[in-house]
Amino acid sequence: MLHILNKPPHSEAAAQMLSTVTEGDSILLIEDGVQALLYVDWPGWNAKADVNVCVLKEDAVARGLSEVAFRHHATLVDMKGFVELTEQHTKILSWY
């Protein structure tokens, strides 16, 4: 499943999302969700062993956070990568 989070990392939506993430899922942080890059202790970085965390590059750049993505082993994806993630997952859940 692809989880798309546009809320800040310490929001109720983020907490609910993290409670449903399972191994093999992907998380895509967009809009205010990219603020998670500011928090080394955000639980999403260690949600599950086999969870892929991606960050929408355009939103990270707009907030001056693209350079810190490597700290969390997050994958920066552009809009093409966003589309590819939606093609890779049969289920998509947006957390707004």
Functional labels for PLM-detected ranges:
Residues 65-96:
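C-terminal structural segments of small proteins and small subunits
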Residues 19-23, 42-50:
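Short, conserved loop/helix-junction motifs that constitute active-site signature segments
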Residues 25-32, 51-59:
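Short internal beta-strands
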Residues 59-65:
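Conserved phosphate/oxyanion-binding catalytic-loop motifs
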